[in-house]
Amino acid sequence: MPKSPSKSSPRKGSPRKASPKRGGKGAKRA
């Protein structure tokens, strides 16, 4: 987790499977 602190933020609110499902990974990075 220390590698990407940004992932820890969204992970707190929603699970990891919900991130890629909604495309949050691309939207958050964009």
Swiss-Prot record:
Motif SPKK motif 4 per record, residues: 19-22
Chain span(s) of sequence motif SPKK motif 1: 4-7
Motif, SPKK motif 3: chain positions: 14-17
Record PTM: Monoubiquitination gives a specific tag for epigenetic transcriptional activation and is also prerequisite for histone H3 'Lys-4' and 'Lys-79' methylation.
Positions occupied by motif SPKK motif 2: 9-12
Bias kind Basic residues: ranges: 9-30
GO molecular function: DNA binding
Stretches the record annotates as Disordered: 1-30
GO CC terms of this entry: nucleosome; nucleus
PTM sites of type Phosphoserine: 14, 19
Compartments in which it is found: Nucleus; Chromosome
Keyword tags: Chromosome, DNA-binding, Nucleosome core, Nucleus, Phosphoprotein, Ubl conjugation
Comment on protein domains: Contains 4 SPKK motifs which may interact with the minor groove of A/T-rich DNA sites. Phosphorylation of this motif may regulate DNA binding. This motif is reiterated in both termini of histone H1 and in the C-terminus of plant H2A, but its presence in the N-terminus seems to be unique to sea urchin histones H2B.
Subunit architecture: The nucleosome is a histone octamer containing two molecules each of H2A, H2B, H3 and H4 assembled in one H3-H4 heterotetramer and two H2A-H2B heterodimers. The octamer wraps approximately 147 bp of DNA.
Similarity comment text for this entry: Belongs to the histone H2B family.
Function: Core component of nucleosome. Nucleosomes wrap and compact DNA into chromatin, limiting DNA accessibility to the cellular machineries which require DNA as a template. Histones thereby play a central role in transcription regulation, DNA repair, DNA replication and chromosomal stability. DNA accessibility is regulated via a complex set of post-translational modifications of histones, also called histone code, and nucleosome remodeling.
Protein name: Histone H2B.2, sperm
Species per Swiss-Prot/TrEMBL record: Echinus esculentus (Sea urchin)
